[in-house]
Amino acid sequence: MDNEKVTDTNPKEPSNVESIITTSEVTPSPPPSTTTSTTTNATTTITTSQPQANIIGGKRSRKDDEIISIQEALNDQLEEEKNLLEEAKEQEQEDWGDESICTFDKGYINQSVFACKTCQLSNDKLFGFCYGCSMHCHLYHDVYELFNKRNFRCDCGTKIQEPNNSFKCQLSGILKEDDNNNVNNINNSNNTTTTTTTTTTTTTTTNNNHLNDIDIGSYDKSQILNERNHYNHNFKGKYCYCDSPYDYKEDMIQCIFCEDWFHENCLKLNSNVTDIPSPGEFSDLICADCLSKNQFLLLYPQIRCYIENDHIIIGDNNNNNNNSNNSNSICKVEGGVITPNKKYDLFCKELWKDELCSCLKCKEIYKDKKVEFLFEKDENSLKKKNKTVDENLDNKPVNVFEMGQDVFSKTLPPTQQRALIEGFSDMKEKLKELFSKKLDKNQVITKQDIQSFFVDLNVNKKFKK
């Protein structure tokens, strides 16, 4: 507390004046943008019973030179602990996957993805890996948590890490019995060739999605490239239009198309609205770049949710182009004209995907744009819904503060409870005296002052005995 500053805000009533301190001495420093434990400071997607935008962050922040009272500092600390507890509860509900296996053999799936800053020092190629590899192969590395990525296959130990020949995936080839069927996912039908080190691989056609059945151990993972994986600046630990590292104090919203994360303030600057809807008022965000690449969405004005004169406006469901008939032969937007519009971010209303046309012609557009995922069910949401309330109650993180209160009231005799409360009250009064003295003299409270304070407090405690 060397930098603690005392300011006389009310010289006529020094006894009622609380000491003023700078935030830098009290507010806990934010975690770094990289983590060595993939679940410690991870933040999660908000999930409720209603469709809702993916949002992370949301911590209160103060300016570095802001002057606050001790009460405000304590309130900030309590708020910080509350936020961390809520975050831990949300983390517990996340389906991170099995940390004992690598998901490479499951193919291109929706999963939590991580990137490694440490490995990037020796390899300028972008790559990502699954939760299992983050807990084994990269456990002691600086790891970026990228949250959920769609249709992504684990890169750990593949050819993309070729410059680092000494690195091997520790979980390669480790499968559970019920995962054996997933080996078929090694090569998707969209891949035309596969490089293997053996000549004994048997190729068979099993279904429309996968062409190759590969037995465990019959391929060399280090010679395979995941050509269908998509990489962006998230894999460098950067997010948003501003290309900044993750800051846990700022709210970020995920675009459903590119799966990048955007700061609320940056969205306000980039969008054509002065404010953005709150999380419960819109379902998904489509960033301006993705909207410009998928302009067919402009044919559906009824999916929009935006703010006008401080009121949430939902697009009209009964527009002329909309047809409630979902027949594959009838196009909802036939004859519609896309009018060039100002570049902006699109906030979509609840159940907006149901408004999209499902005729054969439109389905070809979706396939060409590679946005067929819009019609797929969210596997993660289904898993969370299937998780019972009892499981959540049994496994939820413990509120340490509440647990301490419970232990205090149940285990300590009334006499000891009174002694502790009196001791705390005595310390509080003596702190006020110290602050008032420093305030009268307009002096800064130093580390030595605090050390002397506790020495005197212990001496007085002995005399009382």
From Swiss-Prot:
It comes from the Eukaryota. Residues 12-21 have a biased composition (Polar residues). Residues 34-47 have a biased composition (Low complexity). Residues 1-11 have a biased composition (Basic and acidic residues). The keyword Protein transport does not apply. A zinc finger (UBR-type) spans 100-174. Transmembrane segments: none annotated. Pathway: Protein modification; protein ubiquitination. Residues 1-47, 183-202 are annotated as: Disordered. InterPro entries: UBR7 (IPR040204), UBR7-like_UBR-box (IPR047506), Zinc_finger_PHD-type_CS (IPR019786), Znf_FYVE_PHD (IPR011011), Znf_PHD (IPR001965), Znf_PHD-finger (IPR019787), Znf_RING/FYVE/PHD (IPR013083), Znf_UBR (IPR003126). One of its GO terms (molecular function) is zinc ion binding. Belongs to the UBR7 family. This is Putative E3 ubiquitin-protein ligase ubr7. The gene is ubr7.
